């Protein structure tokens, strides 16, 4: 019997703004670098009578920028006030969280509707297993992005988050996946039976969101298949087991007892304010990808790979400019940045910015290959060493240290070719019988004998002269 199964998913994504001070006080936000409960003040820890400062302007600017880049309509010339969202949990000493009404609404990103974007304060960090709370994080500015329930599969949600995090990297001043948290809301329809919405709180990685949705899809389907009912509830993600566990029945807005915060004046966004922020907005990844294809004439797949890493995209443009911005320069930059450098980054599981490589390093390497100081094979070795040495050594220094310059002494090359011919009787026979590709294995032998220091074109010429007589 065939199954009729569909799902709807919406996300509430929380991303920290990288400010020096917290949202409502002057305490620093570097909570990971200090001892527990040191970056705190009466405002952070909710002392009665402690009055918050006006909200951090940089945090507001970043919320405006995120909302604009997600295509939201801005809330202009209206009071944007902060509310007190009441709930009891050890990480929230005041008993309420300060959270704004929407700054932007009705946007869209990758075909997914954006319900709203607003600002709020991060709570502290509670460790139930130890019974400890660290309030250093309390009050750090958070931007919350609420989506419509438009995602139809775990894969779609995963791709949405990947692209959203890429956008955050382009925007800058936002902390990435390490601090991002998402609440996932999922409901399914199974053989005509509609289940209630389930929320899974505080999932802190893209992989986690994907696993939660896969698990909930199967769990909810099995409940409905057995004739059960999906409860309207909030669940927790048990990351070590990759499962979810019931926490409590789902809250409504009334449960949070929202009231305007009497200690904070409303924000009023003007057109001038929004336009000033817009003027500082970076090029989006999607626009950069399109421009790379049009401006440099490269393939869409190559543009996608380059643009996936902002620093990699920047170094590509700088290298192309140094190489002359012509067809050959672009082709070499694609080969050595998109293909070879990216290969090494993926193998080492690092991002470009972690390598400390500079554009001039890549230009020096490519020029060494262009002028045949080194072979392409050696170029691959050098790029691996450049990454391993974290940019501390230039390509020329590495080439010199490792003795990897191309062999220019013809007699040395001829000697290597003669030895390769002697050890490749079958390949020589096949070549003489008309199989041109058989020569490749002989060339490979020469490259091995010379540790990749031979120029392949020169090797082929010498081999043909010696074999063809």
UniProtKB/Swiss-Prot annotation:
Record keywords: ATP-binding, Ligase, Nucleotide-binding, Protein biosynthesis
EC number: 6.3.5.-
Pfam families: GatB_N, GatB_Yqey
UniProt key word Ligase: yes
GO MF annotation, one: ATP binding
Keyword Nucleus in annotation: no
Catalytic activity: L-glutamyl-tRNA(Gln) + L-glutamine + ATP + H2O = L-glutaminyl-tRNA(Gln) + L-glutamate + ADP + phosphate + H(+); L-aspartyl-tRNA(Asn) + L-glutamine + ATP + H2O = L-asparaginyl-tRNA(Asn) + L-glutamate + ADP + phosphate + 2 H(+)
Disulfide bonds: none
Entry's Gene Ontology BP terms: glutaminyl-tRNAGln biosynthesis via transamidation; translation
Record's function text: Allows the formation of correctly charged Asn-tRNA(Asn) or Gln-tRNA(Gln) through the transamidation of misacylated Asp-tRNA(Asn) or Glu-tRNA(Gln) in organisms which lack either or both of asparaginyl-tRNA or glutaminyl-tRNA synthetases. The reaction takes place in the presence of glutamine and ATP through an activated phospho-Asp-tRNA(Asn) or phospho-Glu-tRNA(Gln).
Family to which this protein belongs: Belongs to the GatB/GatE family. GatB subfamily.
Subunit composition and interactions: Heterotrimer of A, B and C subunits.
Name of the molecule in the record: Aspartyl/glutamyl-tRNA(Asn/Gln) amidotransferase subunit B
């Amino acid at each position: 019997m065939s199954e009729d199964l569909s799902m709807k998913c919406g996300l509430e994504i929380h991303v920290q703004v990288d400010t020096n001070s917290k949202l409502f006080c002057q305490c620093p936000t570097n909570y990971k670098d200090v001892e527990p409960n040191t970056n705190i003040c009466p405002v952070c820890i909710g002392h009665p009578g402690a009055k918050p400062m006006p909200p951090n302007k940089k945090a507001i600017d970043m919320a405006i920028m995120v909302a604009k880049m997600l295509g939201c309509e801005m809330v202009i010339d209206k009071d944007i006030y902060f509310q007190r969202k009441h709930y009891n949990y050890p990480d929230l000493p005041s008993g309420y969280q300060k959270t704004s009404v929407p700054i932007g609404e009705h946007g869209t990103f990758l075909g997914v509707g954006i319900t709203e974007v607003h600002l709020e304060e991060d709570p502290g960090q509670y460790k139930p297993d130890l019974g400890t709370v660290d309030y250093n994080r309390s009050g750090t500015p958070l931007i919350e992005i609420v989506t419509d329930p438009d995602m139809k599969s775990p894969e779609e949600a995963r791709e949405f988050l990947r692209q959203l995090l890429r956008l955050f990297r382009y925007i800058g001043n936002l902390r990435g996946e390490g601090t991002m948290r998402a609440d996932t809301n999922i409901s399914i329809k199974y053989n005509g039976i509609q289940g209630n919405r389930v929320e899974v709180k505080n999932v802190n990685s893209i992989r986690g969101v994907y696993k939660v949705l896969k698990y909930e899809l199967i769990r909810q389907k099995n409940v409905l298949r057995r004739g059960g009912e999906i409860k309207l509830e909030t669940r927790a993600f048990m990351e070590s087991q990759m499962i979810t566990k019931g926490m409590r029945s789902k809250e409504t807005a009334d449960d949070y007892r929202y009231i305007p915060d009497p200690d904070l004046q409303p924000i009023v966004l003007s057109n001038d304010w929004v336009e000033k922020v817009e003027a500082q907005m970076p090029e989006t990844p999607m626009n950069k990808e399109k421009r790379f294809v049009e401006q440099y004439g490269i393939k869409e797949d190559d543009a996608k790979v380059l643009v996936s890493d902002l620093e990699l995209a920047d170094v590509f443009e700088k290298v192309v400019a140094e190489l002359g911005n012509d067809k050959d320069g672009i082709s070499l930059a694609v080969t050595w940045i998109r293909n070879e450098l990216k290969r090494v980054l993926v193998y080492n599981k690092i991002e470009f910015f972690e390598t400390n490589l500079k554009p001039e390093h890549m230009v020096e390497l490519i020029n060494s290959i262009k002028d045949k100081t080194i072979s392409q094979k050696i170029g691959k070795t050098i790029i691996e060493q450049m990454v391993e040495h974290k940019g501390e050594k230039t390509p020329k220094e590495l080439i010199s240290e490792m003795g990897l310059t191309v062999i220019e002494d013809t007699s040395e090359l001829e000697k290597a070719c003669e030895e390769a011919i002697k050890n490749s009787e079958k390949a020589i026979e096949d070549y003489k019988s008309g199989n041109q590709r058989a020569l490749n294995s002989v060339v490979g032998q020469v490259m091995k004998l010379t540790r990749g220091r031979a120029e392949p074109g020169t090797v082929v010429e010498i081999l043909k002269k010696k074999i063809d007589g």
